[in-house]
Amino acid sequence: MGSIGRWFIIPLFAVMVLNWFIGISFAELNGLMPRVQGGTGQYLLAGMGPLPSLIGNLSAYVITEILSMTAEITLCGLVLKGLFLPHVDNRIISIIIMALFLVINLFGVDIFSKVQNIVVFLLIGSMVLIGLIGVCKLGISSNVVDYAANAPTFEQIGGFKGLCSYAELAFWLFIGVEFIIPVAKDLKNPRRDVLLSMTIGLVLLFFVQSILGIGMTNYVSLDILANDPAGTPHMTYATNLLGNAGRIWMGIITILAAASTINTVYASVSRIVQGMGEEGMMPSVFAKTNKRGAAWVGLVVLFVFVAGIIASGLGATEGVSFLLLS
């Protein structure tokens, strides 16, 4: 929003439609191979062989999601330390939260889905509400920005070419639409629910991001949104909107977002490596499950690996962010 203002909603909508077509493809593949554990990796295995499948799974999912999880849980620990626990090391907070979600996922997909439903409901509800307050200009601050007076024109953003260049950025807001696939076999009606869940998720994300973006442009100038001195334009918006209460609320939203990512990565990556173990692309120990059907080896290895990165302090460095964006 900071670079091209509300024009960003156009590439956001276009990318949502493109991701819906991707969702249709995944739903069709799931219909053809409904019992696979690893999802994308086993689709690649059937179509291209073991080596592309191994490389694709590790590079596109396992490594990327480990780095994503590290960044999210580190941010979550920093926010909790800053808001509620100033005297506790943020690394300890992060590892405790990771351990909590490890236990939740060890109880199987039923507990995972119940926790995820609660987290997502609170997250989406909070984002919509804080966005609508901004859209309707109901904040306690009198510092309402006159967006129309400073809005960039179609020519200033580079026209159609400029809009297309921001589609790449918009794609990041829809990453993970296919993460339903590794747990699809545990659904009661996967033929219906796989595509339906992806469709609902995409529409909700578009709606929430649009509302939040419009709200932000009413209380924060485009220059600050693009180049916030603190590097946290969402916190600046919340503070301008509702003062210290807004800052705390946005901090809680940040924690909920991290919790959702952590929970999803645990569930999806453990199932992906389980599928790879079943196909002989990973040690067979990864294919083992506990009595509740959870791929416990993958879950524990994921916890140990990420906890080690966090404990070493690497999770708070720019290196993780650089690798993640790369």
Each model region followed by its residue ranges:
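Transmembrane helix-loop boundary segments of multi-pass membrane transporters
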Residues: 1-9, 75-91, 110-120, 249-252, ...
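Extracellular loop-to-transmembrane helix junctions
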Residues: 1-93, 201-204, 211
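Residue-level signature of transmembrane alpha-helical entry/exit and packing/kink sites
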Residues: 7-12, 53, 90-94, 98, ...
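Hydrophobic alpha-helical transmembrane segments of multi-pass small-molecule transporters/permeases
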Residues: 12-16, 25-28, 54-67, 98-102, ...
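Transmembrane alpha-helical segments of multi-pass small-molecule transport proteins
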Residues: 14, 83-111, 123-130, 144-146, ...
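TM-loop-TM module centered on a large, flexible mid-protein loop between adjacent transmembrane helices
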Residues: 41-45, 49, 82, 199-263, ...
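Membrane-helix boundary/coupling elements in multi-pass transport proteins
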Residues: 59-74, 174, 179-186, 245-284, ...
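Helix-loop-helix junctions that connect adjacent transmembrane segments
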Residues: 87, 117-251
